[in-house]
Structures are given as C-alpha cells and as structure tokens.
Amino acid sequence: MFLTHLEITWKIKIMENKDSEKLLKLLTKNEDEIIEYKVNNNDHERIGKYISALANSSAILNRQFSYLIWGIDDDSKEIVGTKFYPKTEKHGGEPFITWLERMLDPRITIRFEEYDINQNHVVVLVIHMKAGRPIAFNGSR
C-alpha cells in the first residue's frame, strides 16, 4: 500500500528544512528510471553504479535530475530511516563523496541532502545530468 499525499504531508510536518516540499513531491512518486529508493545500502561501488545508471536514464529521457533516496521502504514508501551518512563516510581513507565524484566520468554534479523526519534520517542524492555523453563509473557505463 502506498502512502497518500496527505499521509506523507503528515509524516514530514515536523521537518524544519525549507526543501521539505521538494522531498514531499519525490516521496509521492514510484520508483522508475530516474528515482530509486533504498533503506541502508552503503556499498560504495554499488552507489556509484546506481549514479551512472540514473544519470544515463536521465539523459535518455531528457530529464535534468535523477534521485537516489535512502531511508524509504521501496514497497510501502514508509519513512523508515537509514544508517547511511554520506558526509562522514570514508572510502579507503578518502572522503566518500570526493572519491565518488572522482570515479565518475565525465564529472557531473551530485548533491547529498540530509533530512530528519520524525526522528528518521533520510538522505536524498540529487544527480544533475548535463553531460553530453554517457556517464561512466570506474570506467563502466
């Protein structure tokens, strides 16, 4: 069962972040070629592959942005929270986000946004696709 717009609005009413309306709109959408929900996936290589796939899907669909969202149950869209904190993650001693950006070719803009919703941590990765060619992660498209 999917949450209704009203139910999602109620769930994030405590949010203090000004971007809550943007998050609300994302949470009303089902997974598709440009939106992917995860709960606790912190496998760095897999995240990089997701970014490449989502960015390339954005290009094919002529969409500027795609999203990878942690802390949301795929099926119910319930806000369950995540233990993934990208801004403090490390990959081999290097900051995770720096490593991730370095592994993408060509470089694209990615932005991690973090929210606390009713004591549940939610992370939204915004992938801005503006490159004129397919995005590769670690040499693979």
Language model feature labels by segment:
Residues 2-141:
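Conserved N-terminal catalytic/coupling substructures associated with nucleotide/phosphate chemistry
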